[in-house]
């Protein structure tokens, strides 16, 4: 009897755990969740470090950095990568413009999720190309996809954030914490912690990318493809099951 009772308790706890996990997955594993925001920010830091180290010192997400690098190169007459940086900035802007024009379409959950598929494809192709391929054909296409993703995913629970560069997120972190200190309202503390998580995700992505480049070289970017493809398949599977 005692053994049977223990088994029932085990099954009870197992069922409870399973129910909690289902609720967690349903709540957090979607395209406008804080989890996915951190995942995208991790990928942005990862890709920025990758292109900076392996593709001519150009950033695909941090366009402020590209402006600074471009200015320095102009002054020192280092014109080798100027065209790449200009094309990268224009491609990023074009990605933002395109999603802004098509915003009514991408407000739908399914279309919004599929907007990461070009980034998955480009990262897969880039990892397959040798370093003899000019950076002009590598970096701007990635920047375009980053502009698309940055615009398609920019809000979580009414909180506007940026998954591509950190200056705005740094400001919002301090504003949220400062407002919490002044008002003692918990939502501001939670918002500040969310932005801390975003900052940590970006830094972690850059560190992981820098480390893995030592071993995987140009193929390092495949990790971004793998992460985003797994999430894309997961979300599409959820969508099909609900139909």
Predicted segments, located by residue:
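Short, Lys/Arg-rich, polar N-terminal cytosolic tail immediately upstream
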Residues: 12-31
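Hydrophobic core of transmembrane alpha-helices in multi-pass small-molecule transporters
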Residues: 42, 47, 135-162
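Perimembrane loop-to-helix junctions flanking transmembrane segments
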Residues: 62-79
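Hydrophobic/small/kink-forming positions within alpha-helical transmembrane segments
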Residues: 93-97, 199, 203
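Helix-to-loop junctions at the C-terminal end of transmembrane segments
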Residues: 97-108, 213
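Cytoplasmic-side transmembrane-helix entry/capping segments in multi-pass membrane proteins
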Residues: 109-118, 138-141, 162-165
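A membrane-interface helix-boundary motif in multi-pass transporters
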Residues: 109-113, 210-226
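C-terminal ends and interior cores of transmembrane alpha-helices
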Residues: 121-133
């Amino acid at each position: 009897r005692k053994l049977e009772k223990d088994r029932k308790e085990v099954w009870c706890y197992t069922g409870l755990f399973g129910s909690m996990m289902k609720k967690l997955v349903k709540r957090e594993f979607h395209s406008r969740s804080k989890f996915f925001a951190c995942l995208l920010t991790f990928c942005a830091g990862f890709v920025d470090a990758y292109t900076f180290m392996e593709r001519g010192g150009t950033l695909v997400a941090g366009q402020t950095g590209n402006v600074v690098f471009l200015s320095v190169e102009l002054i020192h007459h280092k014109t080798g990568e100027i065209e790449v940086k200009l094309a990268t900035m224009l491609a990023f802007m074009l990605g933002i413009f395109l999603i802004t024009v098509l915003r009514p379409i991408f407000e739908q959950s399914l279309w919004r999720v599929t907007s990461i598929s070009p980034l998955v494809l480009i990262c897969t192709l880039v990892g397959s190309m040798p370093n003899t391929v000019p950076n002009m054909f590598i970096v701007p296409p990635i920047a375009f996809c980053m502009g698309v993703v940055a615009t398609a995913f920019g809000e979580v629970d009414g909180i506007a954030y940026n998954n591509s560069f950190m200056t705005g997120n740094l400001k919002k972190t301090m504003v949220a914490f400062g407002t919490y200190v002044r008002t003692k309202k918990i939502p501001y503390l939670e918002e500040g912690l969310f932005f801390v998580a975003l900052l940590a995700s970006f830094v972690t992505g850059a560190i992981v990318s820098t480390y893995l480049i030592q071993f995987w070289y140009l193929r390092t970017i495949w990790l971004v493809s793998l992460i985003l493809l797994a999430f894309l398949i997961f979300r599409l599977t959820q969508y099909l099951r609900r139909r």
